[in-house]
Design a protein with these regions (language model features):
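Short proline/glycine-enriched turn/loop motifs at strand-loop junctions of beta-rich domains
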Residues: 305, 312-317
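Sec-dependent N-terminal signal peptides
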Residues: 4-13
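Short, surface-exposed beta-strand/strand-loop-strand elements in extracellular ectodomains
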Residues: 318-324
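Solvent-exposed serine/threonine-rich low-complexity stretches and specific carbohydrate-binding patches
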Residues: 326-334
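Short, aromatic- and glycine-rich surface loops/edge beta-strands on solvent-exposed regions
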Residues: 349-357
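Phosphate-group recognition and catalysis centered on beta-loop-alpha active-site segments
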Residues: 18-295, 350
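Edge beta-strands of extracellular beta-sandwich domains
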Residues: 361-369
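Exposed aromatic-hydrophobic patches
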Residues: 338-344
């Protein structure tokens, strides 16, 4: 309920105070997809989906992880049925239904009728129960409505906006694109939040972006994959005028800098933050740690579906390793606090933290959540 109220507050207000700089709204990129390492017949270790991206199950999993919403990508089949697919071709995320074999030639959803797509192909997953047909936009929006999840539509199809508006209303979805004329079509039918990707404009001066946002009108903001664009000054200039700022799938550790700079929405493949009012199943607390006192914690309990988060107040440089795979090297010249974390499945979490010779960790709070 608290997450839903926060979501409504953000989407129904352009006020900068809707969120604090270190607590952005969290949106799961292509849903709460998951993957695990598997060994191929040739002995190679590769990552395989468990919960496929852009699937109905990815909406439910995003809700389970505690995200406020999901982002999805919309395309037409040959007979103009709207389905979810990110890549230009289906080859990375889809297999043949008959024998679960990989596609040998490039194939687009637009090459197939909807019936052909549903009959002959399934989403790739290491879990046979997840090998289901590519979902329609309507199916995914219905799942968003079921769980009270915001749907962020990365789409160039005005018909997709009309469907989202009809099913979810102004506060239930977001239009997300880099083309002004497409976003104008969304504004004609809805007072939803609109996020403009300014990446295609030649001059990315913030005031030129503001001119584009003013033409769109209503609730709007920007979304960018370019971390060099979303500086503290850029974010502050937009947010002081009531616009939202979304960092889009920044890689480790750059999402932390985006939060320092003041983004209001974090579109992410992995990130999780410490949660208010949610009890952790395992925790670690440390104070006043110096260079000679590194933290090395391996929890013994395996968690099926969880998150490891860290809140750290420090000065100097710290090196943080989450679950042996996500490394953060963070520096502060004056004392301050950063919050970071990652979602994971089917593992016992671990944490390593070291501080530079001239630094000190004032407080370290690590929490493991189980969903």
């Amino acid at each position: 309920m608290k997450r839903l109220l926060t979501l409504v507050a953000v989407l129904t207000s352009l006020c900068v105070s809707a969120q604090t700089a270190d607590s952005p709204l969290m949106i799961a990129h292509r849903g709460g997809w998951t993957e695990r390492s598997v060994t191929t017949p040739e002995g190679t270790i590769v990552k395989e989906f468990v919960v496929p991206e852009n699937s109905v199950a990815a909406v439910a999993m995003a809700h389970r992880f505690g995200y406020a919403g999901i982002e999805c990508d919309v395309k037409y089949t040959a007979d103009s049925v709207m389905v979810l697919m990110h890549d230009r071709t289906m080859n990375r995320t889809v297999r043949r239904a008959a024998d679960y074999s990989r596609l040998s030639e490039p194939l687009k959803v637009s090459d197939l009728t909807f019936d052909e797509l549903r009959r002959d192909y399934v989403l790739a997953s290491d879990d046979p129960s997840m090998r289901v047909p590519v979902p329609t936009l309507k199916e995914v929006l219905a799942e968003c409505k079921k769980y009270g999840m915001i749907a962020v539509l990365h789409s160039t199809l005005p018909e997709s906006f009309a469907m989202a508006q009809q099913m979810l209303g102004d506060d239930g979805w977001v239009a997300f694109n880099s083309y002004d004329d497409i976003l104008v079509e969304a504004r004609k039918i809805s007072n939803c939040l609109i996020l403009l990707d300014p990446g295609k404009q030649k001059n990315q001066n913030v005031y030129n972006t503001i001119e584009r946002l003013e033409r769109l009108g209503g609730r709007c903001g920007v979304s960018s994959m370019k971390r060099t664009l979303l500086t503290a000054e850029y974010c502050q200039t937009l947010r002081e005028r009531g616009y939202q700022v979304q960092s889009s799938i920044f890689k480790t550790p750059h999402e932390v800098q985006a939060m320092r700079n003041g983004v209001s929405i974090l579109l992410t493949d992995f990130a999780k933050l410490p949660e208010e009012g949610v009890s952790s199943v395992m925790k670690l607390r440390k104070r006043n740690r110096r260079e000679s006192q590194p933290v090395n914690k391996q929890w013994n309990r395996e968690v099926e579906c969880g998150a490891l988060t860290v809140e750290i107040e420090f000065v100097g440089t710290v090196d943080i390793l989450l679950n042996g795979e996500r490394r953060y090297s963070l520096t502060r010249t004056t004392r301050g606090t950063d919050r970071l974390g990652m979602r994971f499945i089917e593992s016992a979490p671990s944490l390593q933290v070291a501080v530079s010779e001239d630094g000190i960790i004032r407080t370290l709070k690590a929490d493991v959540y189980q969903y």
